[in-house]
Amino acid sequence: MSQKELWYETLHANFGQYFSVENVLYREKTEHQDLVIFENPVLGRVMALDGVVQTTERDEFIYHEMMTHVPLLAHGQAKKVLIIGGGDGAMLREVSRHKNIEQITMVEIDAGVVEFCRQYLPNHSAGAYDDPRFKLVIDDGVNFVNQTTEKFDVIISDCTDPIGPGESLFTSAFYEGCARSLNEGGIFVAQNGVCFLQQDEAVDSHNKLSHYFKDVSFYQAAIPTYYGGIMTFAWATQNRQLRQLDITTLQQRFVEAGLTCRYYNPAIHVGSFALPQYLLDALTTKR
């Protein structure tokens, strides 16, 4: 790619988005995927895997704050957290802000992602890889949750879209392993795409998760990079009350955690579980 070239995302067959490229910082075909980082004048550094944008410097905080603080503050007493994926380090950064957490395990299939993100996206991890509570495991996520004897309070699946290496993280085998790897009252959350364009994926995840969890739903956030509408995050737990916490309880936990966020707040937390009717209808009829 030349410095003035346009980079086109290939997630959808018939339409998409493009980015102007100021400078290509890194490109490599790793053992598992084709990876590129380039600079864009609006979004800063952009990372893409297999032709699909994964994260940008400009708006990554929305995604990572919602993926971490919603389940962690809903739980309230999490000590052990498992991150599946998350090689750019931003999920780890947000989890590590919770000082009551004692252990953070991250399972990443591709060691190359971790290495180049530390070099080319340093603001994502912001030093979190040096946190003494952190443990990195290079392994397939499905294999890990089905082999480990450890139990976790919160599991965060920072998966790619269900193509290529990320496809296995949308299977029943993975969801069953996650359910088994949670402590009592534990919470599982996962990236589940833009529901207007990827509605079938949301329905499929909902149906599969419902076999292993008593309370399955989604929450949402608007993230500019992921075009097409709101992004949905799968939510699954055995405790139905955790999704219905009142704003006063969340506000108290937020203050006690000493968090300062750019997107997340307790009101956003409560409102994020309100879903558009077209998704609710799909979840009801496509079973």
UniProtKB/Swiss-Prot annotation:
The active site is at D158 (proton acceptor). PROSITE patterns: PABS_1, PABS_2. One of its GO terms (cellular component) is cytosol. S-methyl-5'-thioadenosine binds at Q33, E108, D140, G141, P165. Gene3D superfamilies: Spermidine synthase, tetramerisation domain (2.30.140.10), Vaccinia Virus protein VP39 (3.40.50.150). Keywords: Cytoplasm, Polyamine biosynthesis, Spermidine biosynthesis, Transferase. Its main location: cytoplasm. Pathway: Amine and polyamine biosynthesis; spermidine biosynthesis; spermidine from putrescine: step 1/1. Residues 5-238 form the PABS domain. It is found in: Cytoplasm. GO terms for biological process: spermidine biosynthetic process. It catalyses: S-adenosyl 3-(methylsulfanyl)propylamine + putrescine = S-methyl-5'-thioadenosine + spermidine + H(+). Spermidine binds at H64, D88, D158, C159, T160, D161. Its EC number is 2.5.1.16. SUPFAM superfamilies: S-adenosyl-L-methionine-dependent methyltransferases (SSF53335). Belongs to the spermidine/spermine synthase family. Homodimer or homotetramer. Catalyzes the irreversible transfer of a propylamine group from the amino donor S-adenosylmethioninamine (decarboxy-AdoMet) to putrescine (1,4-diaminobutane) to yield spermidine. This is Polyamine aminopropyltransferase. It comes from Yersinia enterocolitica serotype O:8 / biotype 1B (strain NCTC 13174 / 8081). The gene is speE.
